[in-house]
Every structure is written in structure tokens, then in C-alpha cells.
Amino acid sequence: MSPNFKLQCHFILIFLTALRGESRYLELREAADYDPFLLFSANLKRELAGEQPYRRALRCLDMLSLQGQFTFTADRPQLHCAAFFISEPEEFITIHYDQVSIDCQGGDFLKVFDGWILKGEKFPSSQDHPLPSAERYIDFCESGLSRRSIRSSQNVAMIFFRVHEPGNGFTLTIKTDPNLFPCNVISQTPNGKFTLVVPHQHRNCSFSIIYPVVIKISDLTLGHVNGLQLKKSSAGCEGIGDFVELLGGTGLDPSKMTPLADLCYPFHGPAQMKVGCDNTVVRMVSSGKHVNRVTFEYRQLEPYELENPNGNSIGEFCLSGL
């Protein structure tokens, strides 16, 4: 795992503690003997493959990218806790309640959120998610064990929880399932290649890269009917139901990011752009009438590239946020 991604993820944990005014709980001694980002290690994933299910304690603030069983036990009142889960792009995440011992009447709660939310910004955005915002929250204190298993709609999910009484807590099992047509994705890595396919579905799909990157779109297929390409319009993307847009910003929510470029028509051959933003998103809007596909590669920008932007580069409005 790259140091920069490690830092980006650590910012999520720091933001959470800053928002709740309890950063004193991030003690140096804990940081010295515990590294939550070890779970992103490819070597560790290979070592665990085919072995016994991975088990460990869950912290009040945590981030996980492995399947396994995780137990939270309060050692003092823990009032503002969250755990972020992320899997491979082509996977759903299932959160299963093995055991829950919390006092809902006393103010405890345990909620699953379908996606990630930070500082009021959601991924996927409300515009891109198949469920209304209210239905993306599943409250254990309302549903109980009637919903023991909850599956995400994409490769990220999270839980919020509050436990007052020391000794109380819960145990979860995290599993993943294949997603044949991943729609909304947060990339685990600063470099990669991905093909986003939307087959005859009226939906919007966003691929989020939480780093400044250079992105190269190599293939775009839009608006085909029986193998015949639709005629181009002279009005740009206005009124076109199928297109791809490139977005940049400093938060999680694609709907609050700045549009950088629109791609309205099919093409083959590289189109490259540098984006010096904390978050870069490739977003496909589909009418449901066609099979749309976009293939792109991305890599994290080097520090010298951020300091000296040139060529086909967009990022001046983002650089102050880096």
C-alpha cells in the first residue's frame, strides 16, 4: 500500500475524531502497536488466502479491506464510532451480525450505511445510488436480528455505533460476493486500469480515485443500437442521455464536485488528462437504451507533477486543498 494512500485513509480517521471533538483518544502508544492499514497489504491478503477466517478486535475508529470476523467490546463509553469497509471493485460487501449486546433503550446504536459518508458527503451520491438516502441506513435497534445480513450496493460500506456500558459490544462477519457489473466504486489503489460497463440500465455510475492522478481514457462506447452508432448531435452533451464526465474535488460526493470534461461520443484511442484534486471521478450517465462502456487507466501524480503542471492539466482550483 502506498504511503500517500495510507495518509489519505488516515485523514478519514482524523476527520472523524475532529468532528466529534475527541482526538485525544488517538494516542501515540496505540499508533505504535496497531496499524489498521496493514489490512490493505497484498502480502497479508495472500497469506490469509485459504487459511482459517481472519479474526481481530474492531476499534472505535477503523478501516478494513479483508473478509473475516471482527469483535468490538467497549472498555469505556464509546459514543462516536465508525468503521469503513472496502473490497475489490468487482465485489459486494455483506455485513452479518453474529452477536450483538447493546442497550438500545439506553442510547446505544448500531447502524449500517450503504456506502461511505464523511462530513455530510456521501459516496455514492444520492443521485447515483439505487436507494433513497433514508433507506441506505439500516438501524439494528429498529430491525433487530430480523436482518442479520446486509449487503452493500457497491464495494464500500460502513457502520456507525455507540456503546455506553463497558463490556457490551458486538461481533460481525464481513464477506464479499462477486459483482458482475460494478457500478459505483472507490479504488483501493493509486494506480490501475478499469472498464466500467452499464448494460441497458438507466443509472449513473461513478468510479472514485482518492488521489491526484493522471487519467487516460483509451476506449469509450456510447449509444449503440444493434451495432450501429447513433448520429452525432451538434449541441454537445446537452440533451444526450448517455455520456461520461470527469469530475474533480476535495470531498466524497460526486454531485458536489466540479465537472472537468464531458465525453459525449464514442472514440478509440487515448485521451489523457492530469487532475490535481484530492478526488477524481469518472462518472457514466446512462439512459438504459444502450450498452455503454468506458476503459481507463490511472496513476498517482508525482510531487513534481503537482508543483509544475503542464500539458493537458486541470487542477489549479484543487491544488490549495492538497
Curated annotation (Swiss-Prot):
UniProt key word Ribosomal protein: no
* Gene Ontology cellular-component terms listed: axon terminus; dendrite; dense core granule; extracellular region; extracellular space; microtubule; multivesicular body; nucleus
| Signal among keywords | yes
- Quote the function comment for this protein: Binds CRF and inactivates it. May prevent inappropriate pituitary-adrenal stimulation in pregnancy.
Q: Which residues are glycosylated?
A: 204
Give the organism's phylogenetic lineage: Eukaryota, Metazoa, Chordata, Craniata, Vertebrata
User: Which superkingdom, per the lineage?
Assistant: Eukaryota
Q: Which GO terms describe its biological process?
A: behavioral response to ethanol; cellular response to calcium ion; cellular response to cAMP; cellular response to cocaine; cellular response to estradiol stimulus; cellular response to estrogen stimulus; cellular response to gonadotropin-releasing hormone; cellular response to potassium ion
Per the UniProt entry, the disulfide pairs are 60-81, 104-141, 183-205, 237-264, 277-318
Protein name, entry field:
Corticotropin-releasing factor-binding protein
Which stretch is the leader sequence? 1-24
GO-annotated molecular function: corticotropin-releasing hormone binding; peptide binding
Please state where this protein is localized: Secreted
What's one Pfam family here? CRF-BP_N
